[in-house]
Structures are given as C-alpha cells and as structure tokens.
Amino acid sequence: MDIEEYYDKIYRFCYYKVQSKELAEDLTQETFLRFFDSEYKEQGMCIRYLYTIARNLCIEAYRKNKWDELSDDISDEGIEADNIVDIVFVRQALSKLSDEDRELLIMRYMNGETISDICEVTGSSRFALYRKLKKAKKEFEKLVEGGFFGE
C-alpha cells in the first residue's frame, strides 16, 4: 500500500466535497486513523475502504455543517493566475452537481480510479456506473460550456 498516493487521492476527494483545505486535511487524517484502527486486512482493496471511510466522514461533516465556503488560500499554493481561474471555475461547476455525480467525477477523472474500484465503493454495477458517469460528465460539460452563473 502506497500511503502517500492514497493520502493524496483521499485528500483531493475530501477537498472537493467540503471545499475547505483545513477540513479536508482533518477528514483525510481521520480517514487514515480509522483505517489503521480497523480490523481491515483485505489486500488490494484498501483504496475502496478508504473512500468509504472518507465519504462517511464528509457526510458527517456536512451534517454538522462544519466547513466554510470556498477558501481563498489557492494563492498561497503558488499557482499561476490563469490556473487559479480554471481551478475556481471547475470547483464551482462541480459544486452545482449532485453529491453522487461530483463523487463519481472526482474518483474517476481526478483520482484516476478504475471502474471496478468505483463500483466497489459505490455498490453500483458496471453498467449502472457507466450510465451514471456518462450522465455526470454530460451535466458537468453542460455547466462548463453553457455557463452556470445564470448568464
């Protein structure tokens, strides 16, 4: 198990769900603490279990309403201005999607998870997952191409 690679994927997953750097870091750390405290021993399935823990923690955080709005700490990361606009644009488009669509797009296209892994995490069949991904991608593209600011 490559902890750093998994850590980055879980962090990105949490970050795009909660839109707060600090809360995403906390949730990622809590995900790994719960993972290592658990009795989970199945080899090769770690990332699936980590996503499940992370998703549940994000849901808990949402229910407790503990995160702030989109933080402006992007500039602290040394990213060029054009890239900041793109990042903010993508985040805002993602925020307009349903939780399920956002999760699927993050896992598949940002974290590069396999269809099999996503099926395991979500409990969907391959066929259903392909349909959901196609729908989510189409909705995302519609938001990006058509604008989502009410223009």
Give residue ranges: language-model regions.
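Structural recognition of an alpha-helix C-terminal capping motif at a helix-to-coil junction
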Residues: 12, 26-33, 37, 44-56
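Acidic, proline/glycine-rich intrinsically disordered inter-domain spacer in sigma factors
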Residues: 65, 72-95
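A short, charge-rich alpha-helical start-of-domain segment used by transcription regulators
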Residues: 1-12, 16, 22-25, 102
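Arg/Lys-rich amphipathic alpha helix in sigma70-family domain 2
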Residues: 45, 52-72
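A short pre-motif secondary-structure segment
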Residues: 104-108
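DNA-recognition helix of helix-turn-helix
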Residues: 116, 120-148
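C-terminal flanking helix
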Residues: 11, 32, 98, 102, ...
